[in-house]
Amino acid sequence: MKIGKYNFDLENDPIIMGILNVTPDSFSDGGKWDNIDAALKHTEDMIRDGAKIIDVGGESTRPGYTLISDEEEISRVVPVIEKIKENFDVPISLDTYKTNVARAGVEAGADMINDVWGLKWKDRDMADLVAKSKAAVCIMHNKDNISYSNYVEDVLAELKESIDIAHKAGVNDSQIVVDPGVGFGKDYEQNLLIIKYVDRLKELGYPVLLGTSRKSVIGLTLDVDKDNRMAGTVATTVMGYERGCSIFRVHD
């Protein structure tokens, strides 16, 4: 798969995506990296530790998050993207579901859009932007309720809907990654199930990204707070690797 100018053999060589939240209120690390110097130092540390992609996020998407304006989100992420591009030779993913933010991010140098609403957010213009910019896109499963008739099959069907949106806009298959959306539109049992059956996403024909890092499902299972979820993160990441996932989005 090509992400910007970078080529990855994801089928044979899975990679780590390092999380860089430049937000004051992310569930796990809000406020830690929301200035340029701290963000660059953390980026350097993650690359040293093996991250092959840096995922920049300017708005928390934790449960109960506060929606911010496009302008505020752009003001958070664009300077960071520009500085990372100046200082490091690494592809940048932008974690946003807003087309205006994504456009500004791509213009600043982002190589990939990580869309937690799977191209289904209200403006419905994200797919057109991805098609025109040729950026890679991670299509995540999400919904605003936890009602399913046949859970795993429903997740696959809803991801197919997102993929259809991408195709209709002219997005190429070579640009697409899919994500089961652990922690999004799912209750505790459903999160456990989608991790268990994450290999089913391979049926869609795209690389699979798995993001379980520090998620509440780990905290509930092990009865630990967000600062003590490393063991659960490692365990679920290993499960994902064994089930064919190609990209692992992690804090550590």
Which residues are covered by each model-predicted region?
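Catalytic domains of carbohydrate-active enzymes, especially glycoside hydrolases
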Residues: 41-57, 244
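Catalytic-pocket segment enriched in acidic/His residues
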Residues: 24
